[in-house]
Swiss-Prot record:
Gene3D superfamilies linked: Ribosomal protein S20
Lineage: Bacteria, Bacillati, Actinomycetota, Actinomycetes, Micrococcales
Native species: Paenarthrobacter aurescens (strain TC1)
Similarity annotation: Belongs to the bacterial ribosomal protein bS20 family.
GO biological process: translation
The protein's name: Small ribosomal subunit protein bS20
Keywords from the named record: Ribonucleoprotein, Ribosomal protein, RNA-binding, rRNA-binding
Ribosomal protein is among the record's keywords: yes
Length: 86
């Protein structure tokens, strides 16, 4: 355990950030999974809707600093390729 006051505060803020980041990453996985499910069922409309939602969540995660912008770009590219292949 830290003895320095600022480090005690950082431990608390880091824990809050970790929980928030895990929640956002979980939402991302769910959104991407929805796109993949729609693609597997060959449902073009659902896949397009899910793609827009997933892209939006990826962009929000980048703006919150949860993931890097290149990581989001790669993920969006991958799911877009799957949807466009329908």
């Amino acid at each position: 355990m830290a003895n320095i006051k600022s480090q005690k505060k950082r431990i608390l803020t880091n824990e809050k950030a970790r929980l928030r980041n895990n929640a956002v990453k979980s939402e991302l996985k769910t959104a991407i999974r929805a796109v993949n499910t729609a693609v597997e069922s060959a449902d073009k409309d659902a896949a397009g809707t899910a793609l827009v939602a997933a892209s939006r969540k990826l962009d929000k995660a980048v703006s919150k600093g949860v993931i890097h912008k290149n990581n989001a770009a790669n993920r969006k590219s991958a799911i877009s390729k799957k949807v466009n292949a329908l």
